[in-house]
Amino acid sequence: MAVEGGMKCVKFLLYVLLLAFCACAVGLIAIGVAVQVVLKQAITHETTAGSLLPVVIIAVGAFLFLVAFVGCCGACKENYCLMITFAIFLSLIMLVEVAVAIAGYVFRDQVKSEFNKSFQQQMQNYLKDNKTATILDKLQKENNCCGASNYTDWENIPGMAKDRVPDSCCINITVGCGNDFKESTIHTQGCVETIAIWLRKNILLVAAAALGIAFVEVLGIIFSCCLVKSIRSGYEVM
């Protein structure tokens, strides 16, 4: 039995919210992938709580997209079971998002500590492993930084001359530009702080997006419950 009257308006608004859920899901996946790429470059393959956060963000985004699809099918067919499933899953997603937000706040300092520890370890292998050298050079080029804390970290690397830094530290990169360098010709800020700043900006972005998504999800739960009640009333009449 088709819904009537005010429920048609609720059903239409639910469709709009479902489209918003899809957009939010894509946004979460994109942010999670971006953070994961940075972590992959700067942190070793050791699994830690901090390094798992972007994976959880991606998983929540993918699950939200799936739930939005279930809700769309339920609203379109006015299926009682699908709408109940949609409301329950949407509530679970909200709980996970709260948990992720809390974990992100709790482990914010641990992520930076992991950066520093991993970067220092990889710097020790810069002259021994070409793959490591390529990763660090790319990281320094893309983030306009040099070393872990600052450019002087390279002085403690075995085999590295005291007056030399990798060419990737140079502002204008040319072959051999890191030899006999001047502070004015290289990036002096360390990569750990540079990347930490990038992560803080994006974590704030995620937090702001999460608040917006949570508000939309609450509306989604309310509208879906209204639609479920209307569908159930229709069945009872039949």
UniProtKB/Swiss-Prot annotation:
One annotated Gene Ontology cellular component of this protein: multivesicular body, internal vesicle
PTM section of the record: Palmitoylated at a low, basal level in unstimulated platelets. The level of palmitoylation increases when platelets are activated by thrombin (in vitro).
Chief place where the protein resides: membrane
Entry-linked SUPFAM superfamilies: Tetraspanin
Any GO BP annotation: cell-matrix adhesion
Membrane topology: Multi-pass membrane protein
Pfam families tied to this protein: Tetraspanin
UniProt tissue specificity: Ubiquitous. Strongly expressed in kidney. Detected in spleen, bone marrow, peripheral blood mononuclear cells and macrophages.
Alphabetical list of Gene3D superfamilies matching this protein: Tetraspanin
Extracellular side: 33-51, 103-203
Record field: transmembrane: 12-32, 52-72, 82-102, 204-224
GO molecular function annotation: protein-containing complex binding
Protein family: Belongs to the tetraspanin (TM4SF) family.
Stated role: Functions as a cell surface receptor for TIMP1 and plays a role in the activation of cellular signaling cascades. Plays a role in the activation of ITGB1 and integrin signaling, leading to the activation of AKT, FAK/PTK2 and MAP kinases. Promotes cell survival, reorganization of the actin cytoskeleton, cell adhesion, spreading and migration, via its role in the activation of AKT and FAK/PTK2. Plays a role in VEGFA signaling via its role in regulating the internalization of KDR/VEGFR2.
Quaternary state and interactors: Interacts with TIMP1 and ITGB1 and recruits TIMP1 to ITGB1. Interacts with CD9. Identified in a complex with CD9 and ITGB3. Interacts with PMEL. Interacts with KDR/VEGFR2; identified in a complex with ITGB1 and KDR/VEGFR2 and is required to recruit KDR to ITGB1 complexes. Interacts with SYT7.
Protein name: CD63 antigen
Biological classification of the source: Eukaryota, Metazoa, Chordata, Craniata, Vertebrata
Gene assigned in the entry: Cd63
